[in-house]
Regions:
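Active-site and adjacent substrate-binding regions of carbohydrate-active enzymes
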Residues: 1-674
Length: 674
């Protein structure tokens, strides 16, 4: 690929030369299929995909990968811990945007070895407004089922089998795969109804809370028990057991699956399970009970109902807005969600205080076991810990020793406990990617967030570079801070390019310039991990707001109500048409393929280190430097060639990559040292 953009369209190039690009991948000349647009990739015929993978992987490996009863080993199996994540370049995929797990495999054909890990956004059955982060069960979301794959391989006739073989294929392609771990559910999920004691309840009359006693779950269990008595069990089982046998996790007579079948019905009966869940929810609501909505940021606790603000649903239920008694800057209440009750309360919750010395151990055991079962069943290599910034202890982060997990930290944070549980079961490489934003102390969680990240043993964290314009003071300060943390703390901040949360019309201004620089630095600053959301490589600049269907954030939920004009979507996700950016992304990928063995994972030596005001940055590898990388974060000043050559010194360097033909702003270059 030369430095100038093609005269014919990328679609024409693909039609004319697709067999050449496929052969480069099939014969291991490249680790991805060059010049394959994502929108073309996800439309590839299933048999075409099988043919490509058969020639790439071999018949035996492909057959094994397509058997859900067999497992392709993780490419990370030789690792003894999760530290590999600290230098991983990750791609985040909302499956709803590409419709099926098998389409993740198709999209992965466009992703080279230089982006080695794939984070799959939540895979569970969604709840209110179809929110992926408001799961109603640990069942896999049936909307991610591929009819095309099932027709080609009739034995792959469930979404669970398709997820397993998709991860098998991704492993065979050299990718690690991560799942979202969510410490909350929909407010009336199957989990809430099956295990009322695992959640926090309130009783209200109209728009007023009349009780928030810790023991309210017993009254809710009674309501559910009476419903089953009136309507029978969902699977026809006779009620030959006690109420406590049904609800108590300490009585091991019923398995989780049996309990859920008794209350809701068989997993495959989606409509029947939904009907039972809504009927039970209605009984509970009619008697004045509901789960406490989830909160974020200090003070976390102390809520009241705004009796004037509510939503009326189709059944006539009023869903009131909850508010903080004493809100702070980032205090949020998430009305559709409820968090697991991880700790007992003090004084029967009279003052909304949790007793952090008294964990509800059955809840911790349950969520650790359920996420481990998912890891084992499908073969996930790492977890993204949703809302990892939550730290509700008003006294801040306790002082811990690294070796004291079993004695002091086992019940500190659920995400930490899940990671350690999975590792202890024989998956030592299982890693933890934390959703935190590296903000100042006491802002999104009590105490120092950096200390919290170390206490929960997160290998890497998302950070917040995606939330500012490249080259601004805010962006530069974040980058300088993050790189310092990379070298001085036990976790690695990501150079985050874009996330599904930020692919949102409210944040278009962040991505109207310098997208090529974001990708360049994320790729070639090889001692810092990076994160890129699906579709960035073709994302439109959105100088004016695009259609809702162009934003992947609006597919995190599923809203068909036309009255919600900013969120409603009609039909599938629409890929961007920024083919000029894609061409330059491909050029960077092609060059990275060629030089990767000389730079991957190596420490950086700054030749010109960035600061708040020094926006031109120049670096090479600390060991055996063969290439020099230049990136100009400034939008005001062009690149200073004299300064570059002064910085390079007396080395003989040859320019091999330059983005000037693409844009005279935010120029990026690579020099080869000879």
């Amino acid at each position: 690929m030369n430095g100038v953009e093609p005269q014919q369209s990328l679609f024409d190039l693909w039609r004319q030369y697709h067999y050449v690009y496929k052969e480069q991948y099939q014969s291991h000349q490249t680790s991805y299929i060059p010049n394959l647009l994502p929108e073309i990739a996800v439309q590839l015929n299933v048999y075409d995909v099988f043919g490509i993978l058969q020639r790439r992987l071999g018949t035996e490996t492909l057959q094994k990968a397509l058997d859900p009863n067999q497992t392709i080993d993780s490419p990370l199996k030789h690792h003894t811990d999760g530290s590999w994540l600290k230098k991983s370049n990750m791609v985040g995929i909302n499956v709803r945007t590409i419709q099926s797990f098998f389409n993740v495999v198709k999209y992965a054909l466009t992703i080279p070895k230089t982006q080695d890990s794939i984070h799959i956004l939540p895979i569970w059955e969604p709840g209110v407004v179809g929110s992926l982060y408001g799961k109603v069960s640990f069942n896999i979301n049936p909307e991610f089922y591929s009819e095309e794959l099932a027709r080609a391989v009739p034995s792959l006739n469930t979404v669970e089998k398709q997820l397993k073989v998709s991860i098998n294929l991704l492993h065979a392609m050299g990718k690690s795969v991560g799942m979202d771990v969510i410490p909350h559910t929909d407010r009336f999920s199957e989990l809430v109804i099956a295990y009322p004691r695992f959640f926090e309840w309130v009783r209200r009359v109209g728009g007023r809370i009349t009780s928030n006693s810790e023991s309210l779950y017993r009254e809710v269990e009674e309501i559910i028990w009476h419903y089953i008595g009136r309507n029978g069990t969902a699977n026809g089982t006779s009620l030959s057991f006690s109420k406590n046998t049904l609800f108590s996790p300490e009585i091991p007579i019923l398995t989780d699956a049996q309990r859920l079948e008794i209350i809701f019905g068989h997993v495959s009966d989606v409509k029947g399970r939904l009907r039972r869940r809504i009927e039970i929810m209605q009984d509970i609501i009619n008697q004045g009970y509901e789960t406490l909505p989830m909160t974020m940021a200090p003070p976390y606790r102390g809520l009241h109902i705004n009796s004037e603000d509510y939503i009326l649903d189709e059944n006539g239920n009023r869903w009131y807005t909850y508010e903080f008694d004493e809100p702070q800057a980032m205090s949020r209440v998430f009305g559709p969600l409820t968090r697991y009750k991880l700790f007992h309360s003090k004084d029967d919750n009279a003052n909304w205080q949790l007793d952090f010395d008294n964990p509800q151990k059955c809840v911790w055991d349950y969520i650790c076991r359920k996420y481990y079962e998912c890891q084992q069943r499908f073969g996930f290599d790492f977890m993204r810990g949703d809302m990892a910034h939550i730290q509700p202890r008003p006294d801040g982060v306790p002082t811990f020793q690294v070796s004291d997990f079993e004695t002091n930290r086992k019940y500190y944070d659920p995400l930490l406990s899940i990671k350690k549980f999975v590792q202890k079961q024989g998956v030592p490489y299982f890693a933890f990617f934390a959703e935190t934003f590296l903000v100042e102390p006491d802002f999104m969680g009590y105490g120092d967030e950096l200390a919290h990240l170390e206490a929960i043993e997160a290998e890497a964290t998302l950070g917040d570079l995606q939330s500012s314009v490249v080259g601004t003071g805010e962006f530069m300060q974040k980058f300088v801070d993050y790189y310092r943390y990379l070298k001085t703390r036990q976790f690695a901040p990501n150079y985050t390019i874009i996330t599904a949360d930020k692919d949102d019309p409210r944040f278009d201004e962040f991505y109207r310039t310098a997208n090529h620089l974001r990708f360049f630095v994320g790729l070639f600053l090889t001692d810092m991990p990076s994160y890129m959301g699906l579709g960035f490589e073709v994302r439109n600049l959105h100088i004016e707001r695009g259609a809702n269907e162009e934003y992947s954030k609006l597919y995190v939920f599923s809203i068909q109500d036309n009255a919600q004009t900013d969120k409603v979507t009609h039909g599938p996700f629409v890929w961007g048409q920024n083919y000029s950016l894609f061409w330059w992304v491909e050029k960077m990928r092609e060059l990275a393929e060629r030089i990767w063995d000389d730079v991957v994972g190596k420490s950086t030596e700054w030749l010109l280190e960035p600061t708040l005001n020094q926006k031109l940055m120049i670096w090479t590898t600390a060991e055996n430097p063969k290439y020099i990388f230049v990136a100009n974060n400034s939008s005001e000043y062009g690149i200073n060639d004299e300064l570059i050559w002064q910085t390079i010194g007396n080395q003989t360097a040859h320019l091999i990559f330059d983005t000037t033909p693409y844009s005279d702003q935010h120029i990026c270059r690579i020099y080869e040292v000879r």
